Design a protein with these regions (language model features):
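Conserved active-site motif detector
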Residues: 1-215
């Protein structure tokens, strides 16, 4: 067996949401930049479509035909697929507007899970900081994953160009999201921590408005 996984493939891909209502959930604390999402497949009108679930099992969106095909091929080769949330965006078009986002996708041989997962975890940290490493590289890059234990590509990928009617809403982890993630790591109970923090923030705002004499 080779000591390097040359079958690795990494790329960024857009995903869309079913509706404006469900898409708005991406702005909540259960969908944080750098989080892992599960890729799974559904058959729709004879076509296989790759979908996404967050770490709480909630379906958040789906990929287009081209990306679905790439992921289906990786799945057919028994590769492990990891998806990390790269950003969340909103567009006015098509009417009445839609939430969408981008995932950093990694496909690799599970025999190399230790090295590959460590690399992907480092990329997740970079995404959380608002840094988008270029994950589409050749053999030399793959070899660095196995020879340099802390390696992350220095080359980065830009966000989509700003346009009228389009905005990136979330492209890094906020202070509050970092606190929530720390709570998750301590196994306190993800939902409890998330909602407790939100309640505290709302209460603080209400208190500040009250002190200002607004109510």
């Amino acid at each position: 067996m080779e000591l390097v996984d040359y079958s690795y493939r990494g790329f960024y891909a857009r995903f869309d949401t079913v509706s404006k209502t469900t898409g708005s959930l991406l702005m909540g604390p259960d969908n944080i930049v750098g989080d892992d999402f599960e890729v799974f497949f559904k058959t729709d009108s004879g076509f296989v479509v790759a979908w996404l679930k967050n770490k709480f099992g909630v379906e958040v969106g789906y990929f287009d035909t081209d990306t679905s095909r790439k992921l289906q091929l990786a799945n057919g080769r028994d590769q492990t697929i990891r998806a990390l949330l790269a950003f969340v965006a909103y567009s006015d078009e098509p009417d009445p507007g839609c939430y969408w986002g981008q995932m950093a996708l990694f496909c690799f041989n599970p025999a190399y899970a230790s090295e590959m997962n460590a690399f992907i975890d480092r990329c997740a940290l970079k995404l959380g900081e608002g840094i988008r490493p270029n994950i589409d590289f050749g053999k030399q890059g793959v070899e660095k994953i196995f020879s340099e234990s802390e390696w992350v590509p220095s080359e980065t990928v830009s966000l989509p160009k700003k346009e009228i009617g389009f905005a990136v809403l979330k492209d890094h982890r906020s202070i509050s999201e970092k606190m929530i993630e720390q709570g998750r790591a301590r196994n306190i109970g993800c939902y409890v921590v998330s909602w407790a923090f939100i309640i505290l923030v709302v209460a603080g705002i209400a208190y500040a408005l009250h002190c200002a004499g607004l109510f």
